[in-house]
């Protein structure tokens, strides 16, 4: 047999083995997320859902969304009942896979009374803080000592007005949503605190590994081409890359 022909046969056989070992890429991805206003709306609209469609659907993978409380979303991914959850901080939970690329950054803000001294990342630990249970900001923001975790975003403004906390910590989108409930927004102030990369926490399954590989390949190409910029612009959010 001609040497070149023999080498071609060997290479084709090796390629077939590698492809069989990797397994087929699923045609659908199911992602769970808490319902965040204009980010992961229950009807499938919002910045994050639009970004993820642009990442997966041109690769032949249909996005299926599922709205669940944050801690339940994490648990579903850990048990492999969904392919991943949206809005993970790197290494925040065990038993899942984290990709190389983040798809966005969480713009973390402190909401407080306008009369309270303006906080910074360095001074935040001097204040009494509150945030929604499950977000674990104490693991990502330094020197936090006094904080309470609340079950829902109702009643945050009265909590600040009555001095039960100095600042409420959340992403900019959700902090703006809370501030929008104020009769007089001028009584309050939003202060930027930190930028935390946001990831998909993929299920540690064969499907999850295959989908994560597609995600990282697509993100590298999309960031290089700038194709995600118009989506951030449409939702009036800063471009994080």
Describe each region flagged by the PLM.
Residues 136-152, 219-241:
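Ligand-binding clefts/hinges and TM-proximal coupling segments of bilobed small-molecule sensing domains
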Residues 111-129:
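Flexible hinge/capping segments at coil-to-helix
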Residues 75-79, 88-96, 166-194:
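A ligand-binding cleft/hinge motif common to bilobed small-molecule-binding domains
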Residues 62-69, 145-152, 156-159, 189-190:
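Short beta-strand-to-loop elements that line the ligand-binding cleft
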Residues 47, 51, 123-125, 171, ...:
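Short amphipathic alpha-helical coupling segments at ligand-binding clamshell hinges
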